[in-house]
């Protein structure tokens, strides 16, 4: 993970209807960052349907391209943060839930540990599930994907994994405080003995 560019990349993950997109928008505005719309959301809007199993790599590729472009823009504009609305780890969770396919797990987990300065995990607790035809499935799906994500985040460094619950205001305040602390740690650099 490159922390020398001045911009830190943050994955904002969670199951459907957990406030990821709104939180990314709030954090980008409040913490001098950039964000991009979730590639899966864009894909579904463009195609008018959810992806099939064989189309999952297309979603991951779009995510990685958005992250690369986003980091280039964050650096060019002197931003402190890039907030990634979702991550390949979420695609892995959806692949498991909808297709019983764990084939993305190891790659997504390795990529995640190596490429994000922090992970904001948006929990379902505190936010009601809100229907969004074509984009969201059900409260049952939200809970099932949440449980899969809990399993997938276990290998992530606990100091860089921030769990968020409550309303959007509480999530924003806790995330902001946590990320400001993290940014200070990166600015100080590694401690030497």
Task: Name these PLM-found stretches.
Residues 25-68:
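Conserved substrate/cofactor phosphate-moiety recognition/catalytic segment
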Residues 12:
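Hydrophobic anchor at the beta1->P-loop junction of P-loop NTPases
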Residues 99-170, 183, 187-192:
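A glycine- and Lys/Arg-enriched "phosphate-lid" helix/loop adjacent to the NTP-binding pocket
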Residues 1-7:
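Phosphate-binding P-loop
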Residues 58-114, 123, 129:
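Glycine-rich phosphate-binding loop used to anchor ATP phosphates in small-molecule kinases
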Residues 16:
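The conserved Walker
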